Amino acid sequence: MFQVVYFQVFNQHIVIHLITQFKKIIHFLFKNYKWAKKMKAAGIKIIYSIPGLKVHAKIALIKRKEINRIQYYSVLATGNFNESTAKFYTDHILFTTQKNLVKEMELLFIFLAYRKKADQFPCLQFNHLLVAQFNLQQKFISLINREIENANKGIPGRIVIKLNNLEEKVLIQKLYDASNAGVQVQLIVRSICCLIPGVKNMSENITVTRIVDRNLEHGRIFIFHNNGNTEIYMGSADWMNRNIYRRIEVCFPIPDEKIKKQLTEIINIQLSDSVKAVSLNNVLENIPVIATNNPVQSQKMIC
């Protein structure tokens, strides 16, 4: 694997530097191999993903023997279980015994244990989890379409999405369709954003902001107004080609109203940030958000 870096020198020629990543890859391979050996020695079964299909989902299923019964616990997250990144990444974790999620987590782990591709399991269905390679993109399209249908009926439509990266063309086009239908779309995109906001007859109802502060914004949150019956999802998937088409990703619904309220409050604070936020204009320039009377620094308020 090579990283290609382009930069322009004083004589206006483009110089291409190939920077090898072999040492970095070898380091991680050796580290993973070392830990795999230790875990195997302790009696832990290791299942490797198949080549060409990265498992990017951040999930765990815990089976615990309790008094007179076996209890399952699902852990579903937006970020890695990593002691290093946990120091400066902001992420969210749902810890639940909700039976529908537990059941589908079991199905997903069974699928991963077979080490096959998704198209070899045409009968495997997920009705609650959103799993890339199975139903993730289709479900998000359906959720956007519902907001469009409501807007066409005169019912206010609203979508709020927080991502690291936004690149995948099909989902971007659906957001344009939503904007043209009158749906208010608010995006918080930390890094890559291929959607152009604020263009008349294309994206005039879409705003894009990003927050760069002490901690790296890493969570993925998806909020759909649904005529007042708000649905909220979180998960591991950015809207990029690699996440949608070449990885196993998991997004999951938030069933608890208290958690929904908490997440909505967090997102509203971030949308109000006037200290560390910038907005993207229709030529994708970062425009600082100017504080008015009461400046808001979202990370300080949330922490």
Functional labels for PLM-detected ranges:
Residues V9-N80, S84-T85, F95, N100-V102, ...:
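PLD/PLD-like phosphodiesterase catalytic module centered on the HKD motif
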Residues K87, L107-A118:
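Prokaryote-biased recognition of long, low-complexity C-terminal linker/tail segments
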Residues Q3-V4, Q8:
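Extreme N-terminal basic, low-complexity initiation segments
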Residues K116-L129, G154-P156:
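Gly-rich Lys/Arg/Thr-decorated short loops/hinges at beta-loop-alpha junctions or inter-strand turns
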